[in-house]
Amino acid sequence: MKKFVTLLLCMLPVSLFAHVNDGIRQAMDNYDYETVVTLIEPDCQDSLLLITKAQALKAMNRYPEAIGVLNSLILKDSTNTKVLIDLAECYKLTGNSRRAANCYQKAMNLQPENKFFRLQFIRSLLASEDYEEARTACHGWLERDSLSATGYKYLGQAYEGLQDAASAFLSYNIAYRRDSLDAQTVARIAGIFNNNQQFKDCLLYT
């Protein structure tokens, strides 16, 4: 009898934990994010539950809280690219493009061949007006893929930010030759021509 009672006492926490997990899963499925956050204990150390909590907080636009949870996960495992990208997105949504760039860079260093990480890293640098680093990052991209129209387009934006219109035009021109249907590239070239009152040249591209 004593062994049976002991066994029941041991099984109770496991059963309770499973019940709570089921409740969290069901709440997520039903988009009941407030319940998700409530069910996960403040001192929870389970990484999967903390990721779920961060997702729920993010869905409710509670970005500073989500950032806190995600940073605690990075302290435990700095190589988790999924957490790094979630953290970068939260920083972006709070207008902190520089910190977002740092997260994308860490993810990019872990997976150098991942084009999405590299693209978001450069976009975040441009958004934070860190044009010199964006220029360097674009050259790094083009060393890997010299045919990338997008790489040259962002290089042009970096040069524009650095007030180097000639280099910006050369970069946009290469991007245009690789992808003449990119409306943003065409608009950037037209903008340079208009600023220099080269209206006839502008018409050639538009």
Language-model-detected regions and their locations in the chain:
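Conserved small/polar residues in nucleotide/adenosyl-binding loops
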Residues: 205-206
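Register position in tetratricopeptide repeats
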Residues: 29, 59, 93-94, 127-128, ...
